[in-house]
Amino acid sequence: MFQDNPLLAQLKQQIQENLPKKEGTIKATEKGFGFLEVDSKTSFFIPPAYMKKCMHGDKVIAIIRTENEREVAEPQELVEQMLNRFIGRVKMFKGKLNVVPDHPQLKKMSLKAKTKKGLNPQEFAEGDWVVGHLIRHPLKDDNGFFVEISEKITDADDKIAPWWVTLAENDLPNSEPAGIDDWQIKDDADLERIDMTHIPFVTIDGESTKDMDDALYAKKNDAGDFELTIAIADPTAYITPDDEMDKVARERGFTIYLPGRNIPMLPRDLADELCSLIEGEIRPALCCTVTVSKDGVIGDDIQFFAANIKSHARLAYDNVSDWLETGSCEKWQPSEEIAAIVRDLYEFSQARAEWREKNAVVFPDRPDYRFELSEDNDVVAIHADMRRSANRLVEESMITANICAGKTLQGHFGTGVFNCHAGFKPEKIADVVELVNPEGTLEFTAESIATREGFAALRRWLSKQETTYLDNRIRKFQTYSEVSNQPLPHYAMGLDIYATWTSPIRKYGDMINHRMLKALILNKEPVQKPDDSVGEELALHRKHHKIAERNVADWLYARTLADAPENQTLFTGEIFDINRAGMRIRLLENGAAAFIPGSLIIDNKERIECNGDLGTVSIDKEVVYKLGDVLEVVLADVNQENRSLVAKPTQVFAELPVVEETQN
C-alpha cells in the first residue's frame, strides 16, 4: 500500500533535509560498528547496519539523528572513497571471485569481484595477490561494493611476494627498462674528451656492485695538499633529453633500492656494462679536478672536463678498509702505485672529515642493515654493516665533488638541481631555544640558529652531548630535505651549497646536472635546464621508494623474527619515538622497528604516562625511559598479516606497596 508512495518519499526527504549533517572520516572497528570522526575531538557512533554502506577511511557526509537516546550518524553521501586502486588477495566464495584488501582495517571485508577483459578468471586461485579497482560503492547508489581485478601480481605462496606486492602497491616498476640493440655516443660535436686512460683511477665499491659510477685519483703534492680527480660515469653521452629513454629515466627518478635487490633507473646493459667504470675498460666520463689543502679546505681551482678514462683497479670496501686499518689484507695486496693512491685518498678524506667536523655537520655513524637472501628469496641472515675507513674515503670524495658542482652551477647558471635543507621550521625556533638554552647561558639564540652557521654549530654541540635525548627531540622541529632548481643552502649538512652529479646511472637529477656541466665545458647554453616541477617530482619518487623499502623490510622482519616471541630472544632496542600509546624502538641487532605499548611497560594506566611532547615515559611521575635510551627487550608478538612487531621491556617495575590500615 505504501510501496513507491511519492508522498511518503517526499516526506522522508523533507525530514532528512531538516536533520543536521556532518562531514567526516569513517573509522571501522572489528565488532561491526564504527565512528564518524569529524575532528580530533568529535565523533559519532555508526551502527553496524549503516556501516554496510561504507568502509574504513571513506570520507562521507552523514545525517546525525537520535536513536535509542543516542546520537548516531547515517552516511548519506560519499565525498572521497578510501579505496580506488588497491592491493588485495583473492578469496573464493562459493566458486566466485572475491577480493580481500591488503589493509589492516579492511582485512575482514570480502568484496565481490570480476576480472577485466583479457584476464582469465580461471587462472586466479585462493590467496593470489592482485591489483584491484573499486568500481562500485553503495553511497554512489550502486548495489554494494564491487571490484575489477586489473592484474595478477603473483601466486599465493610465492616467496617473491614482499617485493612484487610492495612495488605494485606503490605503482613502481619491478624490472629495469628495456634496453636498445645499438647504443651510440651522441656527444656534442664540439665536446673534446681528454685522454686520461693513463691516469691510475681506482673504483671502491661493494663486492657485488655492477653499476660502478665513480672512480677516484689523488696525489699529495710537496706542500702536503691533495690534488683530487673524480671521474663519474657518463650516461648522458648515450641519452639526449629528446630520447625516449630520458622520459623513462625521469618517470623513474632513481634506481629503486630494496632489501636484497634493486630496480635500475636505466637499462642494465647501460648501467652495468657500457657506462659502468669496469677495470681495464675505456669509458666516457665527466671529471672534476680540485686541490684540497692539508687542512681540508676546498680550493678555488675547480675544473670540470669531459674525458675518456680507464679504471686501473676495482677495489672492495672491506678489503681496502682492512688494509688501511691494519696495514694488510689477506684477500688483496695492492701494487705500489695503487697503494700510494689509496693512501693519499685516505689522508685527503681524513683532512676533509676533520674540516667538516669543525665547520659543517658530520652525521653520526650508524650501521647499514643488509638482508642476505637465498636463491629462493628466504632471509639467510641480516648483517649490520658499519661504515668503515674505505666507505668514509668514498663519502668524503663524493661530498667534495658535489660541493664543487654546487659552487660551479651556482656561479655560472644560478640554477641546477640542488639538494637543500632549510634548518628549523620558523614557528619552532623559539621551542628549540627554550629546549637547549633555557637559562640563556649558551650561544644559541633565535637569531643565531636561524642561520646556516648557527644551525651547524648547534648540531655540533648536540653531537657532543652524553645522550641523544635532545638531538631526538629537536629532530621533530626540523624541516625536510628538498630538491630545488634554486641554489639554496643545506643546513643539515652545514653547507652553503650542494648539488649531486656523482650518481647519474642511479639519479635523474644527476643527469640534468651533467648536461648543465657539459654546457659550461662547451661554453654553450644547456640542452636541458631543471624546470620548476623537477624538485617536487624527484622528492615524490624518493618518498615512494623509501616507503617501498620500509614495507619490504617490515615484511621480511616479520618473516624472519616469527619465532622470536616463543624463543624469548633478547634484543637491544633504541627508543626513537614516544607517543601517548607507548614507544617505538629500533632493534640494534637487525634494524627492525617495533612498538612497545604502555600496557607492556606496566599494566596500570594510573601509574604510567607516555608523553610525546617531552619524549619521556614516566611511572609514578618518575621518568623511566626517554628518547635515545637503549633497553633490553623481547618480542611479545609478530603479526604476519600487518607485518608489525610488538616488543616488551625485560625490566619489571615493582608493584606499589600495599598500605595497611591501622586500627585506632
Curated annotation (Swiss-Prot):
Q: Which GO terms describe its biological process?
A: mRNA catabolic process
| SUPFAM superfamilies, per the entry | Nucleic acid-binding proteins
EC numbers listed for it are 3.1.13.1
Q: Which reaction does it catalyse?
A: Exonucleolytic cleavage in the 3'- to 5'-direction to yield nucleoside 5'-phosphates
Q: Could you tell me the keywords of this UniProt record?
A: Cytoplasm, Exonuclease, Hydrolase, Nuclease, RNA-binding
Q: Where is the RNB domain?
A: 193-521
Mind listing the GO molecular function terms for this protein? exoribonuclease II activity; RNA binding
The family assignment reads:
Belongs to the RNR ribonuclease family. RNase II subfamily.
Say what the protein does.
Answer: Involved in mRNA degradation. Hydrolyzes single-stranded polyribonucleotides processively in the 3' to 5' direction.
In its UniProt entry, what is this protein called?
Exoribonuclease 2
Organism per entry? Vibrio vulnificus (strain CMCP6)
